[in-house]
Curated annotation (Swiss-Prot):
One of its GO terms (cellular component) is cytosol. Pathway: One-carbon metabolism; tetrahydrofolate interconversion. Belongs to the tetrahydrofolate dehydrogenase/cyclohydrolase family. It comes from Mycobacterium leprae (strain TN). CDD domains: NAD_bind_m-THF_DH_Cyclohyd. The gene is folD. Homodimer. The keyword Amino-acid biosynthesis applies. This is Bifunctional protein FolD. One of its GO terms (molecular function) is methylenetetrahydrofolate dehydrogenase (NADP+) activity. Keywords: Amino-acid biosynthesis, Histidine biosynthesis, Hydrolase, Methionine biosynthesis, Multifunctional enzyme, NADP, One-carbon metabolism, Oxidoreductase, Purine biosynthesis. The keyword Oxidoreductase applies. Its EC number is 1.5.1.5, 3.5.4.9.
C-alpha cells in the first residue's frame, strides 16, 4: 500500500479561493494589494518564476508591479529601484528575485528592503522577529510546509521532526516555526556535516528534505508510517527530481510529491503575505 499524497496543488487552490474574497474586500475599501518584483538579468528560470507569481496575482485581483532590469546594471541602480518600491504606495509588498548576478551583493540588497514590505519574510529584521515569535511576514516555503501538514491532519505537537537542510529559506525558519509553543515539535536540523544521517531520519515522525540532492532520502532511511515532505529540486538530464527517492512511497505514511507538493504553496503564501500586509495583520 502506497503513501497518502500531500497534495500541494489542491491545497493551493483552496487558499486562492479565500484570497480572492479577501482581496475583493480590500479593493472595495480602497486598499487593493500590490505585489512588486525586482528581476535582474535574463535567467530563464527566474523569468519563469516571476511570470508565475504575477499570473497568480491576476487570479485573485492583486496588482502586479514589475521592475525588470538589465543584467549589467550598477549596484546604485538596483538600490534606487528598491528605494522606489519602498516609497511606492501602490506596492504593499515585494521581492528581489534571487539569485542576483554575482557582482551584486544579495545580502546588501535584501537589507535595503523595507521590512514592512518584505513579501518573502527573509529580511534580517523579520527573521529576527521569527526567532522572538513576534508578528512578521513568514518565509513562504516554511509556512507552506506547515500549512500542508495541518491541512492533512498530520500531528505535529510532541513529534520528532528531522529537517535535512539548514538554508535560510527553508531549514532554519522551518525549525523555528515547528518549535513554537503552538506547534511544540522537537526538531533535529541536519546538514552536510551531519554524521550517520540515516540513524537520525529513522527516528523521525516527520522528515523534511530540503537540500537539492537528487534522491538523497531512500526507503531504508525512513521509519514505516513516517511523514515525508520533499522540498529540494535538482535537474537530472532533462527532468526535475526531488530529494526523496520513489521507493520511499512504499514505506512512508504520507509523502508530498515533487513537483506538485510544496512548490505551489510557496507561491500562494507569497500572495498571502501581501494580503495580510494590506489587512494590517503582520
Amino acid at each position: 500500500m502506497g503513501a497518502i499524497t500531500l497534495d500541494g496543488k489542491a491545497t493551493r487552490d483552496e487558499i486562492l479561493i479565500d484570497l480572492k474574497q479577501r482581496v475583493a474586500a480590500l479593493t472595495e475599501s480602497g486598499r487593493t494589494p500590490g505585489l512588486g518584483t525586482i528581476l535582474v538579468g535574463d535567467d530563464p528560470g527566474s523569468h519563469a518564476y516571476v511570470r508565475g507569481k504575477h499570473a497568480d496575482c491576476a487570479k485573485v485581483g492583486i496588482t502586479s508591479i514589475r521592475r525588470d532590469l538589465p543584467v549589467d546594471i550598477t549596484t546604485a541602480v538596483l538600490h534606487d529601484t528598491i528605494e522606489e518600491l519602498n516609497a511606492n504606495p501602490d506596492c504593499t509588498g515585494y521581492i528581489v528575485q534571487l539569485p542576483l548576478p554575482k557582482y551584486l551583493d544579495e545580502n546588501t540588497a535584501l537589507e535595503r528592503v523595507d521590512p514592512a514590505k518584505d513579501a518573502d519574510g527573509l529580511h534580517p529584521t523579520n527573521l529576527g522577529r521569527l526567532v522572538l515569535s513576534t508578528p512578521a511576514p513568514l518565509p513562504c516555503t516554511a509556512r507552506g510546509i506547515l500549512h500542508l501538514l495541518r491541512r492533512y491532519g498530520v500531528e505535529i505537537a510532541g513529534t520528532h521532526v528531522v529537517i535535512i537542510g539548514r538554508g535560510v529559506t527553508v531549514g532554519r525558519p522551518l525549525g523555528l516555526l515547528l518549535t513554537r509553543r503552538s506547534e511544540n515539535a522537537t526538531v533535529t536540523l541536519c546538514h552536510t556535516g551531519t554524521r550517520n544521517l540515516a540513524a537520525l531520519t529513522k527516528q523521525a515522525d516527520i522528515i523534511v528534505a530540503a537540500v537539492g540532492v537528487p534522491h538523497l532520502l531512500t526507503a531504508d532511511m525512513v521509519r514505516p508510517g513516517a511523514v515525508v515532505v520533499d522540498v529540494g529540486v535538482s535537474r537530472v538530464e532533462t527532468r526535475l527530481v526531488g530529494d526523496v527517492h520513489p521507493d520511499v512511497w512504499e514505506v512512508a505514511g504520507h509523502v508530498s510529491p515533487n513537483p506538485g507538493g510544496v512548490g505551489p504553496l510557496t507561491r500562494v503564501f507569497l500572495l498571502t503575505n501581501v494580503v495580510e500586509l494590506a489587512e494590517g495583520r503582520q
